[in-house]
């Protein structure tokens, strides 16, 4: 069959048109790339920091911390870590409990580089077992002595600076402790007097406390007993067999602890009902004094509970579940959340400074965060999923916030306000900067100006405080005028009337 004479030319025209379109498309793409050279960098953007405003809404923020490196066993030349569960920082040394490999890995930071210092798998001294089995935590004292939770060996070993055994802390031989129960120490801290506080698995009476001699001295910081009223009433009428099958009302357990510079114990728990977070009954972060009383200040707009929004995102939902805490020398503290892989920073009043981090496999993201520490201002996160330590360094923005808080605590309110002003130039949505300036003005006696800043961010408590002081100040400043006006309006007319009355009486006589 012969083709029509116009078919070939039409086909050729279409082909030429398509070629021109392809060339134009390529040129257009090239022009876009040239016009926006930063576009490819967006894929590597690590800005994932945020905070919450007065309304409880998520507000993006400049990064206060940025991830700059990760430390792995492979990079150190000793093979990968295996399920590491705890670590500790003292000066420029990092002590890692490489739990699955039954060893302690010591890492040294020198000239900004992290290098292997030594690997400890055994120690000397009079004991039947001088190796570790599943070590889960380590604490290093100021004297360079070590307390290691040798978990599977059911003991805490106290070693001197030469890795020689000093003593063992074992299950207390006390009537308050079930002598048939297992003793699996998981976390430990030691104060300057040698008092050791140990978190033991399935011990729900609080932390186990030992004297510096190794003698058991009791429990500290027992969690409040939580129970359901309906279950309680049901138990009153249930049979013995039914009661045995029901859940026993016991205090919930802690999951980690840390000492601050003043040797108060910060601790975390993730055993609570989510509704208890909303009315601030859960208290997932606590600060215990020597008596075990919670003294954590919670003056923020929202309690320190992590995320305020728990909706499903990327298959993750539910409240934040903190698994570790670390306290800085300026009384700010940080917690790591396993639910979404986030770090939350709070000031000494319980205000959220910022939150950052997420789940993932990139630098600065986490798989299964296990522990949190700090080295100077740097934050370090141990991840048992990624078998690595991620190091976060403070940014210039984060340093401004730290400086503002520190100067306020030192009583340098003018300087503190100046730092907060600089913060606002980088983040105009930062509520805490306005409140910080207001608090500085309040301390300086500039109550009227302080009221303006508190009003901007709906800080009713501080506004009320500033208003009362401003009213008192105003009255004190105007007291002369007030007395004068009172005398002129009330006293003077009465006095004039009295004088006239006397005068009339005298004239009548």
Predicted segments, located by residue:
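Short, Lys/Arg-enriched N-terminal segments with co-localized hydrophobic residues
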Residues: 4-17, 431
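Sec-dependent N-terminal signal peptides
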Residues: 21-31
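Eukaryotic scaffold repeat domains enriched in small/polar residues
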Residues: 42-447, 457-458, 464-509
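C-terminal segment of classical bacterial N-terminal signal peptides
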Residues: 32-40
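Positively charged, low-complexity intrinsically disordered regions
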Residues: 5-8, 21, 116, 205
């Amino acid at each position: 069959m012969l083709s029509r004479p116009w078919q070939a030319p039409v086909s050729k025209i279409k082909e030429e048109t398509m070629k021109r379109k392809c060339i134009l498309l390529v040129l257009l793409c090239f022009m876009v790339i040239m016009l926006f050279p930063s576009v490819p960098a967006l894929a590597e953007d690590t800005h994932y920091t945020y905070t919450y405003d007065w309304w409880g809404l998520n507000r993006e923020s400049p990064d206060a911390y940025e991830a700059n490196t990760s430390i792995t066993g492979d990079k150190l030349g000793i093979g990968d870590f295996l399920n590491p569960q705890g670590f500790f920082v003292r000066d420029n040394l990092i002590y890692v409990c490489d739990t699955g490999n039954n060893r302690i890995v010591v890492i040294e930071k020198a000239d900004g580089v992290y290098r292997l210092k030594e690997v400890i798998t055994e120690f000397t001294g009079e004991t039947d077992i001088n190796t570790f089995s599943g070590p889960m935590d380590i604490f290093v004292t100021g004297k360079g002595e070590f307390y290691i939770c040798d978990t599977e060996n059911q003991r805490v070993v106290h070693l001197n600076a030469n890795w020689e055994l000093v003593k063992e802390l074992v299950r207390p031989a006390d009537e308050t402790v079930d002598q048939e129960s297992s003793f699996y120490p998981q976390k430990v801290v030691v104060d300057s007097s040698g008092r050791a506080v140990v978190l033991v698995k399935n011990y729900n009476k609080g932390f186990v406390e030992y004297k510096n001699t190794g003698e058991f001295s009791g429990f500290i910081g027992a969690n409040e007993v939580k129970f359901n009223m309906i279950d309680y009433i049901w138990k009153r009428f249930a049979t013995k067999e039914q009661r045995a099958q029901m859940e026993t009302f016991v205090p919930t357990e802690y999951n980690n602890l840390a000492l601050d510079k003043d040797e108060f114990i910060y601790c975390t728990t993730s055993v609570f009902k989510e509704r208890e977070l909303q009315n601030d009954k859960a208290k997932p972060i606590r600060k215990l004094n020597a008596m075990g009383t919670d003294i954590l200040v919670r003056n923020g707009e929202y309690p320190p509970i992590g995320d305020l929004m728990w909706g499903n995102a990327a298959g993750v939902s539910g409240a934040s579940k903190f698994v570790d805490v670390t306290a800085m020398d300026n009384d700010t503290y940080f917690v790591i959340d396993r639910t979404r892989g986030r770090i939350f920073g709070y000031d000494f009043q319980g205000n959220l400074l910022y939150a950052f981090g997420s789940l993932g496999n990139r630098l600065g993201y986490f798989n299964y965060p296990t522990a949190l520490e700090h080295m100077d201002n740097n934050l370090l996160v141990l991840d048992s999923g990624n078998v690595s330590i991620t190091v976060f360094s403070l940014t210039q923005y984060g340093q401004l916030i730290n400086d503002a808080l520190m100067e306020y605590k030192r009583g340098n309110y003018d300087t503190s306000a100046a730092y907060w002003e600089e913060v606002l130039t980088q983040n105009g949505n930062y509520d805490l900067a306005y409140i910080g300036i207001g608090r500085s003005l309040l301390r300086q006696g500039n109550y009227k100006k302080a009221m303006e800043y508190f009003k901007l961010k709906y800080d009713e408590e501080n506004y009320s405080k500033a208003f009362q002081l401003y009213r008192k100040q105003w009255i004190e400043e105007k007291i002369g005028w007030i007395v004068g006006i009172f005398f002129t309006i009330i006293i003077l007319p009465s006095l004039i009337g009295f004088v006239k009355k006397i005068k009339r009486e005298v004239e009548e006589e």
